[in-house]
Amino acid sequence: STLMRSSAASDVYKRQINQAAKRILKALSFDGVEVDAFRHMADLKRLDPMKIFYKKIDEKIYNGSHAVPVRIFFPNEKSFQESNDKTSDSRDKKLLLFVHGGGWVTESIDNYERICARLADATGQYVVAVEYRLAPEDKFPSGLEDCYVVAKALYTGKFVLNVKPENITLIGDSAGGNLCAALSLMARDRGEFMPKRQILIYPATYNDYTEKSPFPSVKENGTDYLLTAGKMQDYIDLYAKNEEDKQNPYFAPYLAKDVSHQPDTLILTSEFDPLRDEGEAYGKRLKEAGNYVQIHRIKGALHGYFALGIKHLYVQESFTYINAFLKGEAL
C-alpha cells in the first residue's frame, strides 16, 4: 500500500510538472516575428565551448557572382586528415548535404554547428552545410537557388569532395526540410542531376497557417508549443515576394501537381507541432506517386526537438530511423 501511495503521489507530481511545463510553453508561444530580435536570439547559440573540437573546413561555391559559403564537417579525425591528402580517394565516402531551418529568415551554419558535428558523428558521414541567403533581404527563390547550386556542384563532381552521387543524401529541418523537398522537385524538372535520398525533419510543405489551413495540427498545435501558426504565417510572408510566390510548388512542395520521380524519402514529424500534418501529408502524396517513403511521428516531441542534446530520447529515436534509412533498412 505504501508502494501504491508513492506511485499515486508520483503520478500527481508528474501531472503538476506537466501542467507547469505547459504553462511555461504557452507563455513562450507568442505570435509575431521580429527579424532582428529573432536573429540575435539565434546567434547566442554560436557561444558553444565545444566549437574548437569540431573538425571542419570552409569552402565557397558560386551562384553567378554570389559566393555561397559551405562548411564541411568530418565524422572523425581520420577523415579530417585524409582531406589534406591529395592521394586520398573520397568517391566511396558518404555525404549528407544539410540545409538548416529558421523560417527562411534566421539561423546560420554557425548556429547549427553542434547539430552538424553531431550528425557527422552519429551517422559516420561527411556533412556539408549550406549558408543560403535569408529573407527578407533575399526573398524566394534566392535561398533555394543557392541550395540548388551547391547540390549541383556535389552531385556533378564539381566539389572539393568528389563523392559518388548515389552516396549523397539531402537532409534539412523545418524550413530546411522545405528547401530540400523543393530542391528535389527542381532537380527533377531541370534534369541536371537527381538526388537519390532525402531526409525531411518536421518540414514546412504548405503555404497557409491561418484558420483556412486544411491541416488540423495548425489549429491543434498552433498556439501553445513555441512555434505558433502566427509565427509561421509571418515567416512565409517574409519569404514570399508576393501572393503568386506562395502558389509556386518550389515555395510550398505540397502544391506540386506531380510529385513522381522523387528521391527515397524519410520524413520525421513532431507530435506537438503545427507542421506535423502537412509533413505527413506530403509523405503520403510522395508514396501515392510511386516513391519509396518512410514516415515516423516522434511522440511527445515539439517542433525543433532535433536541436536537443544527443542523449535526448527524441534525438536518439530520430537517429535510429536516420541510420536505418541511410543503410536502406525499413523500421
Spans of features found by a protein language model:
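Residue-level recognition of short loop/turn positions
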Residues: A8, G64-S65
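Alpha/beta-hydrolase superfamily serine-hydrolase fold, recognizing
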Residues: Y54-K60, H66-L331
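Single conserved hydrophobic/aromatic residue that forms the stacking wall/gate
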Residues: S1-A9, Y13
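Positively charged, low-complexity intrinsically disordered regions
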Residues: S6, I24, H40, L47, ...
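An N-terminal hydrophobic leader/cap segment in hydrolases
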Residues: K14-K60
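Intrinsically disordered, low-complexity sequence elements enriched in Ser/Thr/Gly/Pro
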Residues: L3, A21, A37, P69, ...
